Amino acid sequence: MNKLFLATAIILLSGCGPGLVIDKAIGQYNYAESRVELGDSKSQVLAILSPSQATLSSKQKKRSDKYMKDDVLVEIYYFRTGRQPDGLTTDDEFTPYVFNNGKLVAVGWASIGGPKTQGQTQDSITVNNSTVVY
């Protein structure tokens, strides 16, 4: 009986783990992001926001972009700020921070043309104070 209980608990908890890690990172980001302002240096912004993403696995993150444009070094860092219940990691679950020559010049997808990938939202209804996803 104990083995059955333990196996069931492991199965149930292992499915929740990644979502809880992501949700914690999002909460930490939400707490820290108000301290960031346009014009801040890249090192200042990363010192404030990177700790919020530290517990995420590489599959739960989005790699930064770096390129030169008109003699300006453009770097875009993406921070996890959302999660869809579809299990996919898509662009719309991140907020981009754009740096030109090491200074923060823009925050958000509007500055770089919008996300390339988007998650699948699930419709839901509420019945007797319980959310039903379908």
Regions found by a protein language model. Name each.
Residues 17-134:
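Residues within mature, well-folded domains
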Residues 12-15:
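C-terminal motif of bacterial Sec signal peptides marking the signal peptidase cleavage site
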Residues 2-7:
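Sec-dependent signal peptide recognition
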